[in-house]
Amino acid sequence: MDTRSLQDFQDLCTFDVFKSFGHYYGYGVDQQALIDQEFKRIKGVTYLDHAGTTLFPESLIKGFHDDISRNVYGNPHSHNSSSRLTHDTVESVRYKILAHFNTSPEDYSVIFTSGCTAALKLVADTFPWKPMSNKEPGSQFCYLTDNHTSVVGIRGATALQGVGTISVSPREVETRARNKTQTNGEEECSTPHLFCYPAQSNFSGRKYSLSYVKGIQSQQLYPACEHHGQWFVLLDAACFVSCSPLDLSQYPADFVPISFYKMFGFPTGLGALLVRNEAAEVLRKTYFGGGTAAAYLVEENYFIPKPNLASRFEDGTISFLDIISLHHGFETLQKLTGSMTNIQLHTFGLARYTYTVLSCLCHSNGKHVAQIYCDNDFQSIAEQGAIINFSLLDCHGRTVGYSQVDKMASLFNIHIRTGCFCNTGACQHYLAISNQNVKSNLHAGHICGDNIDLVDGRPTGSLRVSFGYMSSFEDCQNFLRFVVNCFVDKPLILDQTKLAKLNSAAPIEPSSSYSPSPDRMAVSEVTMSKDGKKDGSSCTLTNLFIFPVKSCASFEVTEWPLGPQGLLYDRLWMVVNENGVCLSQKREPKLCLIQPVVCLAANTLKLQISGSEAITVPLDPSLEKSDLRTSQSKVCGDRVQTVDCGEEVSAWLSEFLGKPCRLIRQRPEFLRDMKFGQGDCCPTPLSLVNEAQFLLINRASVCFLQEAIANRYNSDNEETWRDTEQLVQRFRANLVISAQEPFAEDNWSHLTIGNTQFQVIGKCGRCQMIGVDQKTATRTQEPLRSLSECRSGKVTFGVYLAHQSARNSTHPVLSIGSHVIPKISDSTDKF
């Protein structure tokens, strides 16, 4: 062991030495500068308690504040427009959460809770525990000894039900593996058991193998291999996901509790339980709160829960504003860091460097300054997180009480965590505290969370420093200099042998980066399934309208090809707000002033506004672009996979609409099926339309309504409604025909336009959106008011169509002037 001067330690605390260790640092020059701007409030503070809570960036709070200042978010249990906005935004956040963990709603559901502990309690209260009987063995609740108190606390619920409890060490899980095959009796046993373990220890930062998930589920690892039945795995990911990517498609744990303030720093008091949908079937909920019932009776013991898992388990009104803030958390995290993989590399590099230097510090007599509690040398990013747990020792090898260290750290504005960190099992293991010691310490007056750090000279807890995505090399410097200045008996000695050994091995990089996979759905073309009677009336197709962007202006053509989802490029784009919720003319009437133009030859979509310079985007985005942003959104309750059209068009739209928004396009390979009116027919693929591929209106019906409106008003106002084309535009139909009789289309089952066949799917129910003048974006009560009167209270106008084509047929072209031959429905009450 060589003696070095304090100057050598100062050299060790330089950024050049840090980089020589081969560490990754930061997220690029621009991003690091941006982070410095985001956390100005901690200037002069060395914050090293990110495992307790990370820090929120200023832009997250500003974005959330701007969001709730611009939008009216109502109670999601209501059905008004503000409530629908809340509901849709919350659903968008659910998708973001699942995408963040590389899974989808097909495999997992998100249940919002008040925190990770509440998520754990939810599992404890609803898991189908089975007490032991003469016929079958009882359930086993098993947990790793290195677990948070909130996990071990499940034991309180199981004890009352006669359920067995098994606590196992990490070594036991891996060494006592199955060495026998299952018997028939074991295969048939359905007794449910639960195994709980942390993806990362909140005490030491040790990462436990995610392969435990499948190992326990398949009953290859202990204790599952010795207790037959059906094993479920609860993966406590709260500590892990703050700095590491979690891929649930590879490691499909049944229950995954998380806490969002660990990830974003805000909001507090909000967590979630991610439930694998197959495992959700076993949960048994007894209490039912507001919003969870499909139906119930007050005078009978009759209750039917809602079919959706989240709706069944989220009692009462969820914390919807806090949930909405998560959107800004994900967006800001992506903007500042690029990915969770980048965060993992950055934080592990800081932790490994700090561990390396701290472990080499020695007093003048050669005794080490720190006893570090870990199971590795911080060489593998797959085995160790960004946490260092330790005790400081004086020159005689005695433990310096953690309260004393904490008080000294406060003088230097260094924020660390002390105690046992709600993890008694790990604390006992690393500090060699026996069961009897715990009881004796309690008798001596020490309880969890107090400042009694030593009992009979033995530590009751330890010190923990932990790093977050905004942590800097300066934080490492400040902490290490604090230790040397305050707790080292000078002159300082560095353990050069250990330093050389630790510096010789480069940290292991992750095997692969996280990349969400889109959902894919298979559809086939619809075929003709029903005959009808021909309608002898003479009709022609008078107008063809394409609506490339939902709720924006129409693009009128004289002929146009059909695509697999309707008219080619019809409603493939939509404008969404900053939370990914679709904007429509109901909330943003100015959308109708945006004129899209599809240029097939140039392969572009041009957007133009009167008085402004136009902007173009490609018709078909290149999915090979590495910077392409993908997301999930909702259209009429359906999930849709989309791609973002870029910052330039986003800025263009945001400036015009006066609020942050983006243009997104349906992914070319994503297919969505029409829901209603098909019977036994093959699925019909849709674009971003609300209900069906095509909307048809009849000019005779428009004229009938036009006359009804005129009759309501005196001659002074009559001229307003004499423009038939203006009224046609309000109904935003793709196909406008001229039949002889008004509302004759209501009785059709099929029709042929030229040589192209269509099935009538149903009538189009109208809303207040037809009250928007498509030329001026002003709102009027008409024509909805008169439509209701002349239709005897009904507000349907026009019919939905689906294209009927033979398999693998070429897509036809529709042209105005084509003959329209309808068939009358067998039942006029069909719709």
From Swiss-Prot:
Reported cofactor(s): pyridoxal 5'-phosphate
Q: Does the keyword Transferase apply?
A: yes
Listed under GO biological process in this entry are: Mo-molybdopterin cofactor biosynthetic process; molybdopterin cofactor metabolic process
Record function comment: Sulfurates the molybdenum cofactor. Sulfation of molybdenum is essential for xanthine dehydrogenase (XDH) and aldehyde oxidase (ADO) enzymes in which molybdenum cofactor is liganded by 1 oxygen and 1 sulfur atom in active form.
Enzyme class of the recorded protein, top EC level: transferase
Give me the reactions it catalyses.
Mo-molybdopterin + L-cysteine + AH2 = thio-Mo-molybdopterin + L-alanine + A + H2O
**Gene Ontology MF annotations:** lyase activity; molybdenum cofactor sulfurtransferase activity; molybdenum ion binding; pyridoxal phosphate binding
Q: Which PROSITE patterns match?
A: MOSC
What organism is this sequence from?
Danio rerio (Zebrafish)
Q: What is its EC number?
A: 2.8.1.9
| Name assigned to this protein | Molybdenum cofactor sulfurase
